[in-house]
Amino acid sequence: MSYNIGVLISGDGSNLNAIINNGINVKFVVSNNQKARGLLIAKKNNIPVYTFKKLLILEEEVSKLISHYKTDLLVLAGFMKILSSKFIHSLPYNSIINLHPSLLPAFQGKDAIEQALNYGVKYTGITIHYVDEGIDTGMIIDQAILSIKEDDTPITLQARIKIIEHDLYPLTIKRLLDKKRSKKNIINECYFLI
């Protein structure tokens, strides 16, 4: 049995590219930004793309797309809008996931990489979590830890974080889809990359 996902993006689509390259069946890509470079990645891979500037319309259309394409999971991959509580609760429990560039619950929201550097922490990483009504507050599925180097800048740290994202996000998506077959949830797994 094949499982399908839908992906929401706002930017360059590097995680979308990693997902596609890992053989995950992406049925559609939606963006709030018609200039998002990730849309070109989707088009190149013959994946239908849709853009909607207004969040309310985007959510209504995504609901229709989920039903039409019979998607099992909605994946946020650099989607920079906050989904409404109404939309989140209109979908099955734990059917939306997000990737965040910090070890949640630390450094929620925007600029997590800069926050980690400014705070002076020795470690950061990534978190994959279910989406709830809060900002980066959903139940944690997976995390990967990365040490911060003394000479790291936001640019160098982001580049190292992206490498981990591109490995762990597709792996976690595959595991979640496999678990759907056995009707189990996976939560709180952690990978250490020091």
What are these regions (language model features)?
Residues 1-194:
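One-carbon transfer enzymes
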